[in-house]
Amino acid sequence: EPVFFEKLVIHLLETMGYSGKHGTAVVTSKSNDGGIDGIINQDPLGTSTVYVQAKRYHETNTIGRPAIQGFYGALAAVNADRGVFITTSSFSANAHEFAKNQGIVLIDGIKLTELMLEFGVGVEIAKTYKLFRIDNDYFEDEL
């Protein structure tokens, strides 16, 4: 479900602190999103805004430069200076090159998974393990 994925992505970015202490984060209306799936206002006045594109594709899919150019066009239409494109798949080298030059952050499926684990979004700890090491100082001192 694309809407669920968009909500997950926005929730992750909020959990990472992108909406700030008093900011807001919303998933845009699907029928009229103009190529932007989420908007994060990082402050109450909305002077610092991050626009988000979220695409849930098969992991073997590669997103190319044209998709990033389309997102860049959507950003330009709202006079945005920053955007994040998040996918469950990967990006081509040309997509990375274009995004870097336009100030667009790309997060692929591997990085998305790492961030979800790091910030505890959609996961829970099932079990923890103790890892022991030898305390050499203990054995060097006389009892």
Indicate where each model-derived feature is located.
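Mixed-charge (Asp/Glu-Lys/Arg
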Residues: 1-143
